[in-house]
Amino acid sequence: MKVIVVISGFTQKNHQNTGSKQLWRELRLLDDLCDGEDAIIHLKEWDSDWKSYAEYINSLEPTEVLICCYSWGGGYGMPQLSKRLQCDVSVVACDPVYHSPTILGRWWAFFDRKIKLDKNVTVVGWLSQRGDRLDGDKLIGGKSICRERTFDYDHTSIDNSPEYHQIAVLAAKTYLQT
């Protein structure tokens, strides 16, 4: 079983036409590359119930999960999900922004923070921008982290960027064909 999860950012809802939803639509066209295995490709909001969702994914017994995440989806959703998964996780992170799990720590999103990754995480794509007041935070830990690539977008448009979509689609093709 192959599992791909696209996690949207702050203020993004699944019913809205966002860069995350556009990416999810692109990735859904790839599931026929799975060479006989089943594939599910889900779009999730950053503040989903990650404990229940991880239980569901774990019940499918995948050997690896691919997560493409943006903003708080990368700074909160992805770390919350990946630490609960019982398999390796590959990540394409687009301008991930730290989000504290506590109410008192929420203001930390406006300062440079580090996003700690669990030991089962490999970052295969990492895009950020540095021009906006709210910019991507550093990823640390995990199995391995690829080089961060910085682009000339603001935070609210980088998830629509062709660079993010190309990197995510390439990672998904590689994942589905292995």
Positions of predicted regions on the chain:
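Active-site catalytic motif of lipid deacylating hydrolases and related acyltransferases
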Residues: 1-63, 155
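Serine-dependent carboxylesterase/thioesterase catalytic core
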Residues: 2-5, 12, 50-141
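Generic intrinsically disordered, low-complexity segments enriched for polar/acidic and small residues
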Residues: 7, 47-50, 67, 148-150, ...
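Residue-identity detector for threonine
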Residues: 8-11, 18, 63, 102, ...
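Short, surface-exposed linear patches
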Residues: 28-29, 116, 147
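Generic structural motif
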Residues: 38-41, 89, 146-148
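C-terminal catalytic histidine-bearing segment of alpha/beta-hydrolase fold enzymes
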Residues: 127, 133-178
